Every structure is written in C-alpha cells, then in structure tokens.
C-alpha cells in the first residue's frame, strides 16, 4: 500500500517508516538526516543491502561506506552479503534484530532486479516482511526510486516501470527546484529529493528532513514538504 503525499495526512497500514533520500549518501551533509532516521527506527541495528551496486568491489565499497557512516552515528551495522553471490547469507543477515534497512544508490534497475528478480526475490520478500513488522527503510537515490510505485530506469533506456509501491508516486533524486533530469508523465505524483535531503513517511505524517527543500508535485503543482520536528 503506497503512502499519499499530503501535509500531515493521517496514514494507515504502514508499519515501518520510510526515508526517501536524494543522494550523496554517507557524506557529512547527511549526518543529521540519518541521525534523525536512526533515532526513529525500532532498534539501532542497521542492515545495508547495496543491491544497486555492481557485484564485487563496488558492492563491498558501498557497504563499507555505509558501515563507517552509521557506526559514527552509534548504530550496529549488519553488512548484508550480496544476494547475487550469497542468497542464504543475505537472508540470514536480515534477522529480527534489524531496525533499519539501508538501500544505497547506484543502478535503480539493478536494485529492482535484486529485490524482485527470480533468483534473488526472496530478499525483496524478506525486506517487505520486515517492513510490515515495523522495520524502517532508508533509501538514497536508486534506493528511494525503487521504494516508490513507479521508477525511471536511466540505465535501461529511461523507461518507467513499477517499483515496490511502499510509497506512492515517483522519486526524483539529485533534485533542485526548476530542474528535471528525466521526462515524467504530467499526471504522476513526484517526490523532489535534494542531495543530502529527503522526506520521512511514518505512521502519522510526511515531513522533510536534511538539506535543501524536499518537495512534492501533485496535480502538476510543486509544493515544499513541511519540516520534520522532534
């Protein structure tokens, strides 16, 4: 069930919070945003699934950057093995102690393949199971794109396909007012996500967090998302 973009709109059937981030993850500019999300998670155990990265050193590097970043914030970090290499290990790492799942950026098409592709779909199913049980998910760039109902795959010719539909609409990472990297349908709801900024969607409301001016487009009109307050 997706989440509608409305100011402090009451939401139902949404167990774990989501954070849609615009990119430049694990950099100093993202510290306060990620600290906020971690504090809202059910536990300080963060599991990193870098499925948007290429197999091998790219995946390992993304996990290492996430580990360093979140350990500085006080989290216990679980480095989830690449499901394309060790599916059983990845599933075992996503246990019930996890309070936050982190999806770094990279290839949105590649991440979607990892989460719903026949060979590794069990990881996506486990992610959704944990989310329904109250586990938060924070996705940056490709990670945010995949969580939405629709996503653009710039690495697959720029086509628009179905995402996980944990949030309504389509995410535009690396966004700033007045810019557009991709063509999008006029009637589609859009999330404008600046680098080191984003939106938190929880059981009660939708709020902006981090840098820039995270915004939402509904009925063709852009409006800023109200700021998160403690």
What residue ranges belong to the model's regions?
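C-terminal and late-domain segments of enzyme folds
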Residues: 2-43, 48-64, 68-71, 151-230
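General beta-strand structural signal in soluble alpha/beta enzymes
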Residues: 19, 79-80, 102-103, 137-140, ...
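A conditional alpha-helix N-cap/helix-loop micro-motif detector
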Residues: 30, 83-84, 119-120
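A short acidic, amphipathic alpha-helical/loop segment
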Residues: 32, 36, 89-90, 126
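A general structural motif
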Residues: 42-46, 97-98, 134
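Portal/gating segments that form or line small-molecule/metal binding sites
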Residues: 53-116
């Amino acid at each position: 069930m997706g989440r509608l973009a409305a100011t402090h709109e009451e939401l139902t059937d949404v167990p774990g919070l989501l954070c849609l981030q615009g990119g430049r993850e694990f950099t100093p500019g993202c510290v306060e945003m990620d600290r906020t999300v971690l504090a809202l998670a059910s536990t300080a155990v963060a599991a990193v699934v870098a499925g948007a990265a290429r197999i091998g050193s790219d995946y390992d590097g993304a996990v290492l950057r996430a580990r360093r970043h979140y350990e500085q914030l006080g989290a216990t970090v679980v480095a989830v093995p690449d499901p394309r290499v060790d599916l059983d290990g990845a599933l075992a790492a996503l246990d019930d102690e996890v309070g936050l799942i982190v999806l770094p950026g990279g290839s949105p098409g590649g991440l979607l393949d990892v989460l719903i592709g026949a060979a590794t779909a069990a990881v996506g199913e486990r992610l959704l199971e944990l989310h329904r049980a109250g586990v938060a998910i924070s996705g940056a760039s490709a990670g945010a794109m995949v969580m939405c109902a629709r996503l653009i795959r710039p690495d697959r010719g720029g086509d628009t396909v179905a995402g996980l539909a944990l949030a309504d609409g389509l995410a535009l990472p690396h966004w700033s007012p007045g810019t557009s990297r991709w063509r999008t349908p006029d009637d589609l709801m859009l999330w404008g996500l600046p680098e080191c900024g984003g939106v938190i969607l929880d059981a009660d409301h939708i709020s902006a967090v981090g840098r820039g001016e995270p915004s939402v487009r509904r009925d063709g009109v852009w409006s800023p998302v109200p700021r998160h307050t403690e």
